């Protein structure tokens, strides 16, 4: 994929927060697949799909201090999340060989 599309696809999927991890990883295609799967799972949990402000560039997949994956949101998306009463989110990402999947649970008050 990297050879075919260069960095163009990576720049569409990844935010500036995620870019350093992509440059460091030994498995860039799997890194992208995991990030895309997580963002898609979030968009589906929100019930919007990828529609502004729920876009690839407004969602960053980050690693919490504990090592657990989580999200960081663009301010406009954060506003939408809070307006829906969502107080916590949970993310799990799994990969096996060339497959990636993610599950997102959103908790509201």
Where are the model-predicted features located?
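Core catalytic alpha/beta fold that binds nucleotide/phospho-ligands
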Residues: 1-109
